[in-house]
């Protein structure tokens, strides 16, 4: 495992310190959160915690199912206790950009339904000025042509 991958693993596991028995959890998307999901599965199987996840992407859904984490769909979940998600980049003010992995809309909905949110990222995601990573763009299907006009200028 590379040094960066080891940092991601440590960060992902550390984020799970906020997880308590009986929680309904938003499960984010990305390479660092993957380690949080693995740790959540361990908390269920080895610690006996009763946890349910709400995935923010199909990748997260597949991994969670493989690991045996019980899941609910976003629309069936109600209020979530905690969401753990990653960031594409963050600055010295802890402003951040996320959603570059293609799950922006679901990540936003899950975050809005959560009482609390932990954003997990290692130092490699820190930038002086936001915008080093490609900026995700969210388009609602009802306004596709309007959005295309805006992007084209």
Please identify what each model-predicted range represents.
Residues 41-42, 124-130:
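Short, flexible, solvent-exposed loop/turn segments with mixed acidic/basic and small polar residues
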Residues 143, 147-153:
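Single conserved hydrophobic/aromatic residue that forms the stacking wall/gate
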